[in-house]
């Protein structure tokens, strides 16, 4: 049984005759007839009955028509997926993240990616920035999301968004912080930051805001354990 035989069979069934089917398939009628006969021999059943107006499906032909259409659809789908894989549009995208991008940036990216490449899948996992860079260079992962990546040979990075930086405070600093209208108003307020892990880090960025603008560090720096 060949794929072209299935196509010929479906064409004859839909056209209701060999002549019309041959025209639609752009072949002469004798080769079409021979292929249908060969298909009937392979199946071991007659698929068409000749009538005054053309041909009609036999009981076996009606059953086989549904299967033939499904087989052809499967072949077409497999061909499309293989072509997509060859173009890099299917398979699994290994995505890693660190920090707040998991809340909005990563979900938005995954939705857009899957809408563009419906035959692909995305595996998402958490990974520190240092581990991300190592995994990207070794080919273990495909793409990483985070903040403040250091310049690394062999890895390309882009700024894809910004985040608003907020200040939270409790007694005895809440009144002073709530009245602050600029970064300079916070110079003497102790800051509690994430530990300085992978460099550059979020803590480095916050401290640099003060140092770059005012040539002065905040009034005090405290860090809390990442396990808290």
Curated annotation (Swiss-Prot):
Highest taxon above the source species: Bacteria
InterPro entries linked to this entry: LysR_subst-bd, Tscrpt_reg_HTH_LysR, WH-like_DNA-bd_sf, WH_DNA-bd_sf
Gene Ontology molecular function: DNA binding; DNA-binding transcription factor activity
Protein name: HTH-type transcriptional regulator TfdT
Keyword Transcription listed: yes
Subcellular location: Cytoplasm
Family stated for the protein in its record: Belongs to the LysR transcriptional regulatory family.
Pfam families: HTH_1, LysR_substrate
Biological role: Does not seem to be involved in the regulation of 3-chlorocatechol degradation. Does not activate the expression of its presumed target operon, tfdCDEF.
All residue ranges annotated as the HTH lysR-type domain in the record: 1-58
PANTHER family: HTH-TYPE TRANSCRIPTIONAL REGULATOR CYNR (PTHR30346:SF28), TRANSCRIPTIONAL DUAL REGULATOR HCAR-RELATED (PTHR30346)
DNA bind region: 18-37
Signal sequence range: none
One of the protein's GO biological processes: catabolic process
Keywords: Aromatic hydrocarbons catabolism, Cytoplasm, DNA-binding, Plasmid, Transcription, Transcription regulation
Main location: cytoplasm
A Gene Ontology cellular-component term: protein-DNA complex
